[in-house]
Amino acid sequence: GINLMSEPLKATRFGYPCDRIPTSFELYFKYKPGTYAHTGDVFETREGTPDFCAIYAVFFDNVKAKAENPLNIPTLDGSNVFTSSSIIAIANLHTCDNAEYRQWEQGTNGEWKFINIPFKGVDENVDYLTLVDPERLKKQEYSLTIVCCSSYYGDFFEGAIDSELTI
């Protein structure tokens, strides 16, 4: 099993089986970053350090994820949501090509913003759509996870306690 106290990132379960291939991640959001950031387990205050949000979606092969998972479950977790070899494509506000979108991760001035982030294959030299087996897709052997967090490093217990992300 997993020790939740010593391995909190592994306690999460990311991914919902799907039978379609995502090509973009769209949503409306507004974000107000907090003014103080907290770091690690000791919650040291770093005045003036701006927080920023995390908004991303990950499309992955859940059969491969299950084979890689020591608990034999077809999900990703906080320790491998960006690094698992089962990942096929990612749509990430933080790394998207649209500079205007990226600036909104630092705040939207109370305004609702619409984003449409294309998925990018992990291997940029290969069209990720060609990596998906249509028969396996029908059997929901691929999964999608969506993560939205008011602090980009919230999974590491770092961020501002007064940041607000509304989806």
Predicted regions located by residue number:
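Terminal, low-complexity interaction segments
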Residues: 60-167
